[in-house]
Amino acid sequence: MTDILFGNNNRPVLKLLTKRSLKAQKNTIAVLAIMLATLLFTSLFTIAISLQTAMQESNMRTTGTSAHAGIKRLSWEEYEKLSSDTGIKDIGYSIIIGNAVGDDFNKTPTELRYGDETYAELIFNTPDTGHLPEQKNEIATSRIVLDAMGLPDKVGTQMELTITTDTDTYTDTFMLCGIWDGDAVAYRQTMLLSKSYTEQVAPVIHGETDGTTPPVGTGYIDAVMMMPTAWNIEKQALDVTSKYGFGSMSIL
């Protein structure tokens, strides 16, 4: 553009300003595109993590444990070998006792076991009220079981219970010492009894097992394990259990 009075030609200046403006706009668009792409990938990553977490939680609720792996029907000596293996980060055990019988349990199948603290924690049986059984006739269980029995969720509550094992039936009175919520999705509920009572009615199995056990498995040990990492859990667990020839291992 030429100024008539002064003879100035502004066209080159205008072109330069226009180019700078377009370049600035392109840079702004590029920055916005990067921001949107970052937001998109972050959202997708968050959704993927959320879905994985939800699937893991659902699987844990169904199997009834947060453990990486478990192995069933061991003798005490077999468990000792397994628990001393350096390929296992943490391990807990339970001793199978039997099943609760009676009308209260027709719709709420309930098993009875002794479990150590690690086992109780990994199968979501750590009491939020009270404690795990210590005295001989103490018992801990879920609010789901107490509701099925028509009992209050109050520590100190007395209950009469009939238990069937592989070889006998026992009816005893227990005092409630620990309570947790329980999960209705679990395939069965659990009652935990003291070690001294368990030794009386379900002495632990010793020696070498051959893979054949009676229906209930009274006296046998179930173990739950945490591996060093959550990567390729099945291989880690198999590497450990194969050393001892255990064939009943289940990946959880």
Task: Tell me what each language-model feature is.
Residues 4-5, 30, 34, 38-41, ...:
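A near-ubiquitous, low-amplitude feature marking generic local secondary-structure context
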Residues 23-28, 32, 36-64:
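Alpha-helical transmembrane segments
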Residues 48-252:
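Basic-flanked hydrophobic alpha-helices used for secretion and membrane insertion
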Residues 1-39:
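N-terminal Sec/SRP start-transfer signal
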